[in-house]
Amino acid sequence: MIRWGLIGASTIAREWVIGAIRAAGGEVVSVMSSSAERGEAYAAENGIAKAVTSVDDLVGDPDVDAVYISTTNELHHGQALAAIRAGKHVLCEKPLAMNLNDGCEMVLKACEAGVVLGTNHHLRNAATHRAMREAIAAGRIGRPIAARVFHAVYLPPHLQGWRLDKPEAGGGVILDITVHDADTLRFVLNDDPIEAVAISHSAGMGKEGLEDGVMGVLRFRSGVIAQFHDAFTTKFAETGLEVHGTAGSLIGRNVMTQRPVGTVVLRNEEGESELPLDHRNLYETAIAAFHSAIGGNGRPSASGEDGVWSLATGLAVVKAAATGGAVEIETGL
């Protein structure tokens, strides 16, 4: 059994990850919050035996094998390195870090320590995206030439905090949502982005110069161009992912979501057909793969390197939106 410590008494851990760890046969043994009162209440609410107030206390606990980091973005790098130094496996929320040097250091140190580092890019675990990846690899749409991502959502009131008003914490829609688009596109297309252009704005939610909406285009190594629209402000939009090829199109609807839902339609000269899907909890799939990787079987659903790629893409989109120019995507890996 893999025993987990939570770095951050977060909403995502409470709503998704704690249950996924338990469903995958693991146990959550400790939670760290800088507030002792919050940590103790969170532990009691979620059936966790220990609550601590420092990262060192959590990663120094011999009962902890792996940590899940879901604090604000500027804390990820230091907390991950502390866990890696202590010999703990690390599953970290995106973005891995605030800059590429820190992200690459996390990957390097995990490799040197012989521990597993994963990025919690949940969307590549969706049955919809896996079916699209398989269909493309099988040649069912011919050569991919373009893609479109619709990932404009409404940020619920209980999450309308640092994402909207703390630039120093890595707030804004690009580092929160666009990084997911980048990872999903890399996974589905089995291709890497090399260039970004974008325009961002604030429609009233984003403060302190932070964007709450962005549209842009990524150019991939193969020549595919991918359009994306991300926002915190759209209450009634539908999410989706489309990939268009020389011999067909894949139309994914309601697929950019944490829930195991959505449909994928293959459209070609023969007509339309809905791809069969085996919907499963995305986070349970991710944790099961992470447990297997700890045991020496396979790799995490999204590795540390995958997290660096999505970070590099997000940072390029931020720069492109700020400068109005095309920005090359380089990872430093």
Swiss-Prot record:
Transmembrane segments: none annotated. It catalyses: 1,5-anhydro-D-mannitol + NADP(+) = 1,5-anhydro-D-fructose + NADPH + H(+). NADP(+) binds at residues 9-12, 33-34, 38, 71-76, 93-94, 120, 162-163, 283. Pfam families: GFO_IDH_MocA, GFO_IDH_MocA_C3. Its EC number is 1.1.1.292. It comes from the Bacteria. The keyword Lipid biosynthesis does not apply. This is 1,5-anhydro-D-fructose reductase. The lineage of its organism: Bacteria, Pseudomonadati, Pseudomonadota, Alphaproteobacteria, Hyphomicrobiales. It comes from Rhizobium meliloti (strain 1021) (Ensifer meliloti). Coiled coil: none annotated. Catalyzes the NADPH-specific reduction of 1,5-anhydro-D-fructose to 1,5-anhydro-D-mannitol. Belongs to the Gfo/Idh/MocA family. One of its GO terms (molecular function) is nucleotide binding. Monomer. The keyword Oxidoreductase applies. It is an enzyme of class 1 (oxidoreductase). Keywords: NADP, Oxidoreductase.
